[in-house]
A protein has these predicted regions:
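Conserved short alpha-helical segments that host acidic/polar catalytic motifs at enzyme active sites
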Residues: 1-237
C-alpha cells in the first residue's frame, strides 16, 4: 500500500467525520494516536474534549444548546492496564468492560453495530494500542451498514504487529460530505508520521476543515516506559 500524506488527505476532505490515526513516531520511540471529531449540526458542534482519568470524554460546551446527548456524549479514550482504547462512541466502554473480562477486542465489537442514525448509519470506528515491555502493536476496527442497508452489519478488524517507525494508519467515518453521508470504504489508509507531539497536533488540526472541525486529541506513549503526553485542542473556548 502506498503511503499518502495525512495533511493532504485531511485538507482535501471537508467532512471525514470522526477519525482515528494510530502509528509509531519517526524516531521509533512513541506509540502515537490521534482522534478528532467534526460536526455539521449545532448539536454536534456544541462539544469539547475534557480529560477524564487517563482518558477523555466529550462534553457539551453550552449545556443549554444540547438537544440530543445520545450519540455525541461519550468517552472516546479509556486506558485498561497497558492497553489504550480509542473509539468514536460508547463502544469504548464495551471494549473496556469485555476486555476486562478476558474477551478480545474483536469479540467485544461483535456485540455492537453501526450507529442507528438513519439514513447515515454512521460506522463505529475503534482502535486499540497494546504496549508491553518495549513491544507495541495495534488494531483497528470498523462496523458499518451494508451499503446503507441497516439489516446487515459488516465488521472488519485490521491488526498491525510490530509497526514501522514513521508510519500510521488512518480510518474515518465518512468518505466525504453528502446526504446521506457515505461510509468509509476499504482498509485504513497508510500515512506518514513525522515530528514531535506538537508538530503532529498542529498538522492534524490545521488541515481539518475550519468550519466543521470541533475537537482533537493526540497522545504520544513512550514504548519503553508506558509514560505518555497528551494534547487536546477544542474549537470552542
Amino acid at each position: 500500500m502506498k503511503s499518502i500524506s495525512l495533511a493532504n488527505e485531511l485538507a482535501g476532505n471537508s467532512y471525514p467525520g470522526r477519525g482515528i490515526v494510530i502509528g509509531k513516531s519517526a524516531d521509533g520511540k512513541y506509540a502515537v494516536t490521534a482522534y478528532f471529531i467534526m460536526g455539521r449540526s449545532e448539536n454536534s458542534r456544541n462539544r469539547v474534549f475534557v480529560e477524564d482519568g487517563e482518558g477523555i470524554r466529550t462534553q457539551a460546551f453550552d449545556p443549554s444548546k444540547l438537544s440530543d446527548p445520545s450519540l455525541i456524549i461519550y468517552a472516546p479514550v479509556r486506558v485498561l492496564g497497558n492497553k489504550t482504547i480509542v473509539t468514536n462512541g460508547d463502544q469504548t466502554d464495551t471494549i473496556y468492560e469485555l476486555m476486562d473480562k478476558q474477551q478480545t477486542f474483536e469479540q467485544a465489537l461483535r456485540t455492537r453495530e453501526f450507529e442507528p442514525d438513519a439514513p447515515n448509519y454512521t460506522p463505529r470506528i475503534s482502535g486499540i494500542m497494546h504496549i508491553d515491555n518495549g513491544t507495541y502493536n495495534y488494531a483497528m476496527s470498523i462496523l458499518k451498514s451494508n451499503n446503507g442497508n441497516p439489516d446487515s452489519c459488516n465488521r472488519y478488524t485490521f491488526a498491525y504487529q510490530n509497526p514501522v517507525a514513521g508510519e500510521a494508519h488512518f480510518i474515518h467515518t465518512y468518505m466525504e460530505d453528502g446526504n446521506p453521508l457515505p461510509s468509509f470504504e476499504g482498509e485504513p489508509k497508510l500515512v506518514g508520521l513525522e515530528g514531535d507531539i506538537d508538530t503532529f497536533t498542529s498538522l492534524v488540526w490545521e488541515n481539518l476543515n475550519e468550519e466543521n472541525k470541533v475537537s482533537l486529541f493526540v497522545r504520544y506513549i513512550d514504548i519503553e516506559t508506558g509514560k505518555y503526553e497528551t494534547r487536546i485542542v477544542n474549537k470552542n473556548k
